Design a protein with these regions (language model features):
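Alpha-helical bundle segments that constitute or directly flank the non-heme di-iron/ferroxidase center
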Residues: 2-30, 53-64
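Amphipathic, non-membrane alpha-helical segments in soluble helical-bundle scaffolds
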Residues: 3-13, 40, 87-94, 130-133
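Short acidic/polar alpha-helix capping motifs at helix-coil junctions
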Residues: 9-12, 24-26, 68-69, 81-82, ...
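Alpha-helical packing segments of well-folded alpha/beta enzyme cores
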Residues: 9-12, 16, 20, 58, ...
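Solvent-exposed alpha-helix faces
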Residues: 18, 25, 51-52, 102, ...
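Surface-exposed helix-capping loop/turn segments at secondary-structure junctions
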Residues: 25-33, 109-117, 153-156
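Short, contiguous alpha-helical
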Residues: 33-76, 119-170
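Acidic/histidine-rich alpha-helical segments that form the ligand environment
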Residues: 78-117, 131-136, 146
């Protein structure tokens, strides 16, 4: 891929809005709070994580790279407890994420004559705006995979003694 592929990346981010919407739809409060194991995140925590990443990480860092400026420090791994993701309302959390994604797509599609090679630098590393954009999409895929795995594990738990081996290897 090269910087001419930004439309493809942005279109995939827009497409993933629908993927996330469908994954998050129809989840009961019990299901939304269920964790696949001790120390693992629930659906509620994942949706709040990707909501904050949407606004405070990826969108902000693409902007910072395009403007050749620093971006505020972030600590996404700590946010789950610091921001009490588990204590939030699931339906509102999903709506907030989808709204932030809509803002991101509108903003990304409004960009014209952009130097996607513009860099964001901090003491740990540097990355181009294009690099952040591609990683944004990769981050979507990481969490789509995570949520699909959580769906499978939830089904496995609820299925009890029924073997899921016929479905294929996980």
């Amino acid at each position: 891929m090269d910087i001419n592929d930004t439309k493809f990346i942005i279109d995939r981010l827009a497409h993933n809005t629908g993927v996330f919407r469908e994954i998050f739809t129809g989840i009961s409060p019990e299901y939304a709070s269920w964790r696949p194991a001790e120390g693992k995140w629930s659906f509620l925590e994942v949706v709040n994580h990707i909501r904050d990443e949407e606004e405070l990480d990826f969108r902000e860092r693409v902007k910072a790279a395009l403007e050749n400026r620093e971006a505020p420090a972030i600590h996404p791994g700590k946010w789950v407890t610091e921001k009490n993701y588990a204590g939030r309302d699931y339906i509102s959390s999903v709506a907030n994420f989808l709204l932030e994604r809509e803002h991101s797509i509108e903003w990304l599609r409004s960009l014209k004559d952009i130097d996607w090679n513009s860099k964001w630098t901090n003491p740990q590393f540097e990355m181009t705006a294009y690099g952040f954009l591609v990683n944004w999409l990769a981050h979507d895929y990481l969490h789509i995979r995570q949520l699909n795995r959580m769906n499978f594990l939830y089904l496995k738990e609820k299925a009890g003694d029924v073997s899921l081996q016929y479905a294929g290897d996980w």
